[in-house]
Amino acid sequence: MARACMRVGEVLKLTPKDIEDRKAIIRDPKSGKEAEVAFLPQKVADRLHKYISDNGIKPEDRIFPITYAAARVVVKKAGDLVGIHLKPHDLRRHAATYASRSGTPIEIVSKILLRHSSLSITQIYLGKISDVEAIRWIDNLHG
């Protein structure tokens, strides 16, 4: 979820036939037709292909056949292990914030990673930039 900025529901609906090399095809829930594409980092794509192969998952079967509630528990337990309160959507938000703060253009974060319909949604989503961060970027720009 985190590396591809995918929503938990999108991840839970994925089947092997939805994975094309480094793309995850997100289908319209009503028609089943391709609605959006989430791009996968190479390591994620490699691990996902291996997971599908190692577990003998059929092309039409869900890769992660768990409920949303079960996914919440998995993510919560992972957060507990490192001492933070964590929900599935936090992973998507963190990935987008990390990309933005690492210098990825806001247009890429918005349209490609988050697949938002407008930049204004992404700006609200990413939140306010702290004074410390603003100063760091100014220093990076002007040495």
What positions do the PLM features span?
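Short pre-functional
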Residues: 1-7, 97-98
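Active-site/catalytic core of tyrosine-dependent DNA strand-transfer enzymes
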Residues: 41-84
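Short, polar N-cap/turn motifs at the start of nucleic acid-interacting alpha helices
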Residues: 19-21, 85, 105-124
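Conserved tyrosine-mediated DNA breakage-rejoining catalytic core shared by Y-recombinases
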Residues: 4-50
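Short basic/aromatic active-site micro-motif
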Residues: 84-103
